[in-house]
């Protein structure tokens, strides 16, 4: 298969134009979408969309309870699915929750989310990756700028830009508690990064990403084109959907206010993983689902 988005192959970074649609369902069918035309326009232009108060207060309480019960149950468990902060033993992320936990399986199968995702991707979908992210007050560490698609393409073999990340806020998101930051319009440009991917790179990158991180000049250019940086803020229960190639990152959290979220990545069934474009070993199933792929269709 031709590599349309080569990265980590040269000693100089390069910005390539996107070769894929942003919204896969024809825009003539906007009236059939579960979101408004204005929301579709915003997603297509910016590469992300925040929907505030998506989940009710009761649903948020249930999800908050579930993420902390799971965290407490495995705090002393040694598991590759549990990622801990690089300078402590605090849990940073728990992966593969959509298949390992019945409650989060139900959340992944929420019709309200699936209707939007299926419309944007123009097909049935499956969960490529799921995780809970914990960013406690005073301790939560930063995560450098990156495009998820760059990693999924190079290390997992995701062929095209036909996936969407859904971040469910389970804490109030402020502009100061290590929030998600996104560069508007960056999904239209692929930053081909420098470096060579070693086997098992994920063991380090999930704690602190060093490869697949864009250079400063490319980031300056993306922010110039996009007109700056956006920070979705809002109450717990808000949902932010962002396109697989949207450049994003977050700062450390030095405030008393935690920022926790449930993160689901939906990939089109027409965009299933092939061999990693790095030529290296496949990442584990709990990071990049290949084998067990329950398909979320309009029928079920």
Swiss-Prot record:
Regulation: Stimulated by FeSO(4) up to a concentration of 1 mM, whereas higher concentrations inhibited the ectoine hydroxylase. Also inhibited by ascorbate.
Keyword tags: Dioxygenase, Iron, Metal-binding, Oxidoreductase
Cofactor note: Binds 1 Fe(2+) ion.
Binding site for L-ectoine: 129
Region (Disordered): 1-23
Pfam family, one: PhyH
Functional description taken from the UniProt entry: Involved in the biosynthesis of 5-hydroxyectoine, called compatible solute, which helps organisms to survive extreme osmotic stress by acting as a highly soluble organic osmolyte. Catalyzes the 2-oxoglutarate-dependent selective hydroxylation of L-ectoine to yield (4S,5S)-5-hydroxyectoine.
Descriptive protein name: Ectoine dioxygenase
Organism: Virgibacillus salexigens (Salibacillus salexigens)
